[in-house]
Amino acid sequence: MRDGGASDHRRGAGVSDVEGLLRELAPQVLGALVRRYEQFDACEDAVQEALLDAAVQWPEQGLPDNPRGWLVTVASRRIIDHIRSEHARRRREESAAVSVPADAFTAPAPDEERASGQDDTLTLLFLCCHPSLSPPSQLALTLRAVGGLTTAQIASAFLVPEATMAQRISRAKQRIKATGAAFRLPPEGERADRLRVVLHVLYLIFNEGYTATSGPELHRAELTSEAIRLTRAVRRRLPGDGEVAGLLALMLLTEARRPARTGPDGGWSRSPSRTAACGTGGSSRRASSWSATP
């Protein structure tokens, strides 16, 4: 997995390379900011601004030595400006100084982020799949905050108006804020149950993409590919978990069957099948705990 360091990235990357890198780093950066500042909405806005800056600058100026650290630093400056503005507007500098850590007003240096090497993607997934949220809200928030899809893309995938999807995501964020959920992994005693919720959400995203429940398209590739990408991210953090490996195996094997699904002979496509076999890493036997997709 990329750690945002210079060894993985070449300077002068093209626009498509930058877009792919930003998509991968976005949840890591958002997780780092939420962990530090504990303001989901403000952190997401700050990350989006940093991503826009990077999308403009990096194709022209080349990648920074530590792309993830660059994004965290730029986004941190945005959210610090937001915090200061809020404190000034509400005239609560003294009381805020008590509740906000002293280092919250200092953006971390890129080297600090590189040294920490912490990937908060899994923690962010747990937060987006908080049990207080309804399944539709869990799906929408996961695709927005962790998947990096725009509200318009999510609305299009589920064939609802963009305004409706925006309200759903906004209500989900407000609900999480109201519960006071801390940005940390669930306690050991709750982790297995919470992980099952996360995996169920990823399975629902994949299933909706593989067999669309509405619209003219039989298959929505943006959803299946996103579900596979996020499940891979979970497996990187939990390489020994059989349920995670089983779900990934099911997704890869099912997706490998898709090109032949509407073909004339219904046979396997060798190239996708080889990809699936490599990707499962011998874990396909664990997929039996998940319902097979038609």
Task: Kindly label every feature range from the protein language model.
Residues A26, L30, Y37, L51, ...:
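C-terminal flanking helix
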Residues A26, P136-S137:
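The N-cap/first-turn positions of alpha helices
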Residues R2-D3, D8-G31, D41, G189-H200, ...:
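A short, charge-rich alpha-helical start-of-domain segment used by transcription regulators
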Residues E86, E93-P136, T142-Q153, V160-P294:
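Amphipathic helix-loop-helix modules that constitute alpha-helical solenoid scaffolds
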Residues Q48-A55, D65-E94, K173:
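Σ70-family region 2.3-2.4 aromatic/basic alpha-helix that recognizes the −10 promoter
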Residues L21, A32, A140-R144:
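Short alpha-helical segment immediately N-terminal to, or the first helix within
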